[in-house]
From Swiss-Prot:
This is Ankyrin repeat and SOCS box protein 3. It holds the Pfam family SOCS_box. The keyword Iron does not apply. Pathway: Protein modification; protein ubiquitination. It comes from the Eukaryota. Probable substrate-recognition component of a SCF-like ECS (Elongin-Cullin-SOCS-box protein) E3 ubiquitin-protein ligase complex which mediates the ubiquitination and subsequent proteasomal degradation of target proteins. Recognizes TNFRSF1B. Interacts with ELOB and TNFRSF1B. One of its GO terms (biological process) is protein ubiquitination.
Amino acid sequence: MDFTEAYADTCSTVGLAAREGNVKVLRKLLKKGRSIDVADNRGWMPIHEASYHNSVECLRMLIRADSSENYIKTKTFEGFCALHLAASQGHWKIIQILLEAGADPNATTLEETTPLFLAVENGQIDVLRLLLRYGANVNGSHSMCGWNALHQASFQGNAEIIKLLLKKGANKECQDDFGITPLFVAAQYGKLESLSILISSGADVNCQALDKATPLFIAAQEGHTECVELLLSSGADPDLYCNEDNWQLPIHAAAQMGHTKILDLLIPLTNRVCDTGPNKVSPVYSAVLGGHEECLEMLLQSGYSPDAQMCLVFGFSSPLCMAFQKDCDFFGIVNILLKYGAQLNELHLAYCLKYERFSVFRYFLKKCCPSTPWDHISEFINHAIKAQTKYKEWLPSLLLAGFDPLNLLCSSWIDSVSDDILIFTLEFTNWRRLPPAVEKMLSARASNSSWALQQHIASVPSLTHLCRLEIWSHLKLEHLQSDGFIRQLPLPRSLHDYLLYAEVLRMNEVPELAVFQDGEISETT
């Protein structure tokens, strides 16, 4: 039911007179014996109307008509007494009259809100002084979540009220239901003056909420540079862990949210154990997660490792692997990581296949030859199988870069890929001299496959093909990063083409591969 809207047809004539401050009409109604305790749809009686609308004389008349404690303290359906309503509007005289008549300065609404809290919320310092004079409790919970008046004053940045509450004995370390103190609130919302007052009063700058977040962490997260500076100069610890897993620090928050000025403050002060330490998470991951290139470069420039440590928290083996999840920031982040020496491996090639970044796949092959043995060959093959429908965009590049096709010829590849792909893979081998285990799997596959696959396996490789394989066996992997080395061999162009499998590519209608250039990758790479 909506208790915020007053329905005109539910308000009594006495209530309406009190609302309008019509003393003359109210006096006549009282003389006629009209009731003063008829409630409207919100549970508001005439005493509530007079208090909320600052009808001083009407309130006095109502109290003279019934000065009982029950009437003075009567509540609306939401648990507001007349004192709450007057405090919410800052009606000093009304509040004085109610308090003198016996109103409870510590009364609470259904949401456990006190008149003192409402006075603070509305910035009514004179009302606050009056309530305190009549015994309002400056401590304790003033709202349902345990948030009290000092929290509210700190949130609003009301310096006068903060000073008054502290002077009257407010607990500067009071916590709400989430373990948050007023100082934490000031840091969270960037209330620099509130923060300064609380620090000067001795409030703990290293307090922690129930989730272990600190004022420094929350200020760094929210981008309040001046608050971060004040906290650091006041003894806030940048190495105090801010989560249960003991890895999250203020530097992570600044990096993830892109607050470069704060990051610049924290980099020289933060212990480097988070860089590559086991069971930690490098802030490099945070910068990549947030997609903030400037923060990423700041960290790497200051000496943080571009490879970091394996991150079980986010499920990535390196920041470069995480970068694949960043659509709009991908190329900028990858370029920065490579610029600072990020090590490429087969997992990065696998992620290229997973996210169908085939141009980047070819670029990575150029930057990092597929050296053996691979530590994550199974994961690579799984992604390769899923990307088989677009094999022409990546498989030729992989095999021409010197990747041993025998690494592909495992049971999952042989059983899963199409005949065309399997035949294409075999073109880079001597298919009549394969390991027995591979021959057995191919024979089983061929028995249930097309005539083309059966014919290919049964055929004898040409002498020229065997010579090609022999020449390739003497090439180093770095010679195969591009076709440049082979093109420079003192051989006719037709032999260059043959060594580069031109006839195989042509037969399989593989498009001409892009000519790679050194430099940064982009959407057009």
